[in-house]
């Protein structure tokens, strides 16, 4: 490291080689380079290389904020040494998701006496350790923790409570019915609550939504500006969140400007919640709003609520009509230039004049979408998934053509059926451009019934003249996240329930979306996250190869139910795609009859940066020796989740072999291999670290799921 340098070779014309010594760069350039180095490597390795680096690595710009989140190689000893060397300099410490570190690691946070922000979500933390730590961190203003079974607020010392009384921001994930530390936080301005409480204990007992005996029931919300609650499925979560909301219904904070409740399924409105909503409509001016669908379906709140400069709306799964959306929410297009994130997922009538006498599959009213696009011209994140948004033949008024005006979009979620042509084209039988798929050569004929594809990327799909989807993506060159999900798609692996054995057929218009449309995605140079689900007309997967070759920033890939269900016809092309994915970190693959054999894992081994792998295949098979070889060759893999049709014995043996062989070298290794249709699946899932479960194992739409930068 003392002679960091880069050799720049001359061209074949015989130019001399030039040697650039990186130590000759300015401090500003070197600091920028070092900002990309993980904190542990920076302090424990790079700092020791030479005197200049030793000085630069201790620069405040590098030591004030330390991020250990997703630093999967960090160990207890490394954390101890890191905090020993620079603990006094750290103002922000993010250890979110460090589930593999023992609870004793938290003791070393005591060295960071000047901490202002601390994130311990997903870390093992007891009431006593929390008390001891917070008693020392008197400057703390932002805190994120988990509240697990056994948490006892009575064990918190007076010094700890004094620190909590000064905390302004709290993020709390609840795994047990409790207020946690909320009653102690008397100055709260931002409160984020994640309810992950199961309805049954491990022993099978039904849990109650009542809080533990002795807990204060008076949270202090008077200074609250941001309230966010996200509920996992389950009755207990709903009961507990009502207790948190009860205080809000008595007196709504005057400065409240963000109010978000994300609740799956049915979450009935009560008298208390109705009083809360009425109070909000009278007394506050909001900038962000999300409510359970049953609370919104009456629309009474939206008629009276006042908005200031709204930046986030989520009306996910509600029956909001397009006319109401234009008239009441976007105010005829006058006031929503500030809106940057909009979630209309599952709003099946949001682009139609009304919801009466209308089928979900009927064509949309393009004038409503046009009003939305004009009014919300600065949108960065838009979710229109889980609905049938079919366009008519009106020239220039197709959904894709209208969305192409949103030049600032960074993330977009669309139903597959929305990107096809108008109704006239939809009535034609689906066709793939076979000539585009075949390799060029003398006398090479296509075998009947066997699809082939071009192995040379340059021979891929040319832009069809009439493709509105190609035109859309040509206009969205900044797009980083794209989701194309079938309107009727449901994952075989839902939350807290047995696996789903059957799924609804794809929308008839989705039958016209195939390899050519998938190839259009390759235009997105900056694409980082891609989800494709329920595209039944994928014949060869040739479009995937172009994506792999041209989208070199791709980090997360999720594929589900592509092509025919009985056979993975796109597998050869997919394996060719993987050879290009050198920077891919997360891969989720859901396909009913997927054979994870040696060929597949050999191709996957080209993904040298891969960290997390999840395979879900109801009738799928595994080749154990191929899995072991893959794990040995891909040294970064720390999560391996496979839910297939293999026997319980075979799954357990493979899981034990992986853990036994690689756990010592990979402290964060999390392995779950289990039969998908086994009755104990939900019990196995509950032990998966929430970070992996939420980000990759469970399928969901993530575009505009919550406001951007909700937490630091």
Regions found by a protein language model. Give the residues of each.
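Alpha-helical bundle protein-protein interaction modules that mediate dimerization/oligomerization
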Residues: 109, 117, 121-125, 133-136, ...
């Amino acid at each position: 490291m003392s002679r960091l340098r880069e050799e720049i070779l001359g061209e074949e014309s015989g130019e001399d080689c030039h040697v650039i010594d990186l130590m000759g760069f300015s401090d500003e350039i070197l600091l920028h380079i070092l900002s990309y180095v993980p904190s542990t490597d920076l302090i424990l390795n790079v700092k020791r290389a030479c005197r200049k680096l030793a000085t630069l690595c201790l620069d405040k710009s590098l030591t004030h904020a330390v991020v250990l989140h997703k630093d999967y190689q960090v160990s207890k000893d490394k954390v101890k040494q890191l905090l020993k060397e620079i603990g006094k300099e750290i103002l922000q410490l993010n250890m979110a998701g460090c589930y593999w570190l023992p609870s004793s690691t938290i003791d070393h946070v005591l060295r960071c006496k000047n901490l202002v922000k601390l994130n311990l979500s997903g870390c093992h933390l007891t009431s006593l350790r929390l008390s001891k730590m917070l008693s020392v961190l008197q400057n703390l203003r932002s805190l994120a923790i988990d509240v697990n079974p056994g948490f006892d607020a009575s064990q918190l010392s007076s010094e700890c409570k004094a620190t909590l009384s000064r905390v302004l921001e709290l993020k709390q994930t609840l795994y047990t019915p409790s207020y946690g530390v909320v009653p102690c936080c008397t100055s709260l301005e931002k409160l984020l609550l994640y309810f992950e409480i199961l309805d049954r204990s491990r022993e099978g007992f039904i849990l109650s939504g009542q809080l533990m005996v002795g807990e204060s029931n008076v949270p202090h919300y008077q200074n609250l500006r941001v309230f966010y609650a996200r509920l996992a499925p389950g009755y207990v979560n709903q009961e507990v969140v009502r207790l948190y909301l009860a205080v809000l219904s008595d007196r709504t904070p005057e400065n409240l400007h963000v109010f978000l409740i994300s609740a799956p399924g049915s979450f009935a409105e009560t008298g208390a919640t109705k009083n809360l909503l009425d109070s909000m409509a009278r007394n506050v001016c909001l900038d962000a709003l999300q409510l359970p669908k049953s609370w919104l379906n009456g629309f009474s709140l939206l008629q009276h609520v006042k908005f200031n400069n709204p930046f986030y709306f989520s009306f996910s799964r509600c029956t909001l009509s397009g006319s109401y959306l234009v008239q009441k929410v976007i105010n005829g297009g006058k006031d929503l230039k500030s809106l940057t994130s909009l979630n209309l997922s599952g709003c099946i009538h949001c682009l139609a004049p009304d919801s009466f006498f209308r089928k979900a599959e009927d064509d949309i009213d393009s004038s409503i979408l046009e009003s939305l696009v004009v009014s919300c011209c600065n949108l960065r994140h838009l979710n229109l998934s889980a609905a049938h948004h079919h366009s008519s033949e009106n020239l220039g008024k197709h959904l894709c053509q209208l969305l192409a005006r949103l030049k600032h979009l960074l993330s977009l979620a669309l139903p597959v059926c929305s990107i096809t042509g108008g109704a006239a084209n939809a009535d034609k039988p689906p066709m793939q451009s076979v000539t585009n798929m075949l390799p060029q050569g003398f006398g090479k004929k296509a075998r009947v019934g066997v699809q082939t594809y071009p192995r040379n990327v340059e021979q891929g799909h040319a832009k069809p003249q009439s493709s509105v989807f190609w035109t859309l993506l040509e206009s969205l060159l900044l797009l980083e996240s794209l989701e194309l999900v079938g309107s009727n798609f449901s994952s075989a692996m839902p939350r807290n329930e047995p696996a789903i054995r059957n799924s609804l057929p794809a929308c008839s218009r989705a039958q016209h979306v195939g390899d050519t449309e998938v190839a259009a995605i390759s235009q997105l140079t900056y694409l980082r996250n891609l989800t494709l689900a329920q595209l039944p007309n994928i014949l060869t997967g040739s479009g995937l190869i172009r994506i792999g070759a041209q989208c070199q920033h791709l980090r997360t890939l999720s594929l589900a139910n592509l092509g025919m269900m009985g056979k993975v016809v796109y597998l050869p092309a997919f394996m060719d795609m993987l050879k290009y994915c050198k920077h891919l970190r997360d891969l989720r693959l859901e396909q009913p009859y997927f054979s994870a054999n040696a060929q597949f894992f050999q191709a996957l081994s080209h993904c040298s940066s891969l960290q997390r792998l999840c395979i879900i295949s109801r009738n799928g098979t595994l080749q154990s020796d191929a899995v072991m070889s893959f794990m040995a060759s891909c040294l970064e893999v720390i999560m391996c989740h496979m839910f297939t049709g293999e026997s319980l014995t075979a799954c357990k043996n493979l899981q034990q072999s992986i853990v036994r062989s690689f756990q010592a070298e990979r402290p964060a290794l999390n392995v779950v291999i289990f039969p998908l249709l086994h009755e104990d699946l939900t019990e196995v899932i509950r032990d998966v670290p929430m970070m992996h479960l939420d980000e990759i194992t469970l399928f969901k739409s993530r575009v505009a799921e919550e406001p951007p930068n909700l937490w630091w």
